[in-house]
Structure formats: C-alpha cells, structure tokens
From Swiss-Prot:
The gene is rplP. This is Large ribosomal subunit protein uL16. GO terms for molecular function: rRNA binding; structural constituent of ribosome; tRNA binding. It comes from Sulfurihydrogenibium sp. (strain YO3AOP1). It comes from the Bacteria. The keyword Phosphoprotein does not apply. GO terms for biological process: translation. Belongs to the universal ribosomal protein uL16 family.
Length: 138
C-alpha cells in the first residue's frame, strides 16, 4: 500500500493552524463526470484517502477513471505514549490534507450515475467528514 506523502516539505514541524471559510479553489468537477464534495471542514490522513480510493475503485470496477483531488501535504507530530508535557514538540507521525467545505475530494468518469453514487457513498463512510455527490456542469 503506497500512502501519499510529500517528497519535500518546507517546514518539518509546522503549526497546526485552523480552517476558515469555504473552498474558493478545487470546488468544481474539472476532470471527470462526477465528484465527491466535502460539506464540512476537516483533516484527511493519507490512510483515509487511500481507504476511500480503494472503496471507489472496487465499486466502479473496470472502465472507470478515478482522480484524487486532495493531497496530504501537512506534517502532523505526535509525542510518545506516557510522556510528560513539555520537552519540545513531538516527532513526525503522519501527513494530513486540509479540507474546506466545497472542496472536491475525488472525481470519477466512465460509469453510470447509480454506480458513481454507490461508490462515493462507500467512500464517504471511510472519511471523517460529511460528503455529497456532485455532477459536472458541462
């Protein structure tokens, strides 16, 4: 299983930050016919993204094209278990993608709408945020 992670990061241990507002970019279906859109803000780990991708691919079967529109670029640190507070920030644990409401997470083409709806429904169960199916505006 190849988990997504950046080759290089500008900062090894960045601050957490917070998510404000709605997505102004990556909020329309650009490549496929159907998209999975986030309805609330959140952070997706590379494991969650991979689990959702596998669910989509299994449901869509052959002839389908899947695009992943999110990438986990933010490093997340974690201190070891049973460690007292202080003594600096913890070591790198995993990477997360920051998602705003309206962000398109996955796109799908080459399948009927019912198949896409079921694939995205299963993928949505793997994610910690609410999602919905959107169609291309072409």
């Amino acid at each position: 299983m190849s988990l997504l992670q950046p080759r290089k990061v500008k900062w090894r241990k960045p601050q957490k930050g917070r998510t404000k507002g709605k997505a102004t970019r990556r909020n329309q279906v650009d490549f496929g016919e159907y998209g999975l859109q986030a309805l609330e803000p959140g952070r997706l780990t590379s494991r969650q993204i991979e689990a959702a991708r596998i669910a989509i691919v299994r449901e869509a079967k052959k002839g389908a094209k899947v695009w992943i529109r999110v990438f986990p670029h933010k490093p997340v640190t974690k201190k070891p278990a049973e460690t007292r507070m202080g003594k600096g920030k913890g070591d790198l644990d995993h990477y997360e993608a920051i998602v705003k409401p309206g962000h398109i997470l996955f796109e799908l083409a080459g399948v009927p709408e019912e198949v896409a709806a079921e694939a995205f429904r299963k993928a949505g169960h793997k994610l910690p945020i609410k999602t919905r199916l959107v169609k291309s505006v072409e």
